[in-house]
Amino acid sequence: MKEYYENKVAAVTGGASGIGLAVVEAMLEMGARAVTIADINEDNLNKHDSRLNAQYPGKVQGVKTDVTREMDVKAMVDAAAAFGGGRIDLLFNNAGLGLAGAFEDQGNKEWDKAFAVNFFSVIYGVRAALPYMKAQKGGHIANTASGIAFVHFPYQSMYAATKSAVLGLTDSLRFEYQDAGVRFSTIIPGTVATAIWDGGPIPDSAITPEESAAGILKGAAENKRVIFVTNDDREGALNMTLGALGHSILEPAIGEYLLGVARARRSGNFTAI
């Protein structure tokens, strides 16, 4: 796997914390030539830009990026390509929001923000990177979705909708651009102990950002269509698919399971999964 990342030019949105930062650090450890950290949190961005440049001189740059603004994303990708000598090999559209709550409590303003951060940011990144990758006849765009794109947990309809959209978009683009040499992968990163939980209780099954990043980068190097970092997510996707096809045992079991989650969350236990 190390050889895949040697001398690569990469950009990572949401790259100054959590999974994104772990992906940045792992690529640098494996010999990436130029890595752009894109993030809206300027304090985190400056801190990790300085720290990593001290460790990997001249191989890291931080670019403040609001992923809900297409001009910001394009400027970031252009800066990443310039930093890499006119090319970009890898784009990780990783920035996102964790979302939960009752459907009736969420208005159009909340839905607009959810899709702006979790979905349209991915479109903006793809649009900005494609011209470079098509011209160089190669590249890889990996978009972060979630296991909820397969297992649609109640009281997370907004999150399920946005991440399902990312999965569908990425899967379609993978085959649309395969002959142009551009790879697309959907990342299912697992339940990860990051700031996305915003001070709430973290499930016992959560893995570390570093563990998630290792699985992500292995899957990308192997050009996986869908990168399942954990077996839990892989099995959940399989069970939901078989259930939807009418599996006589799985379908009622899945229904009972998700109904149980709904009831637990309705009573205030949002770590119920």
Language-model-detected regions and their locations in the chain:
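Conserved glycine-rich Rossmann-like NAD(P)H-binding loop of the short-chain dehydrogenase/reductase
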Residues: 32-48
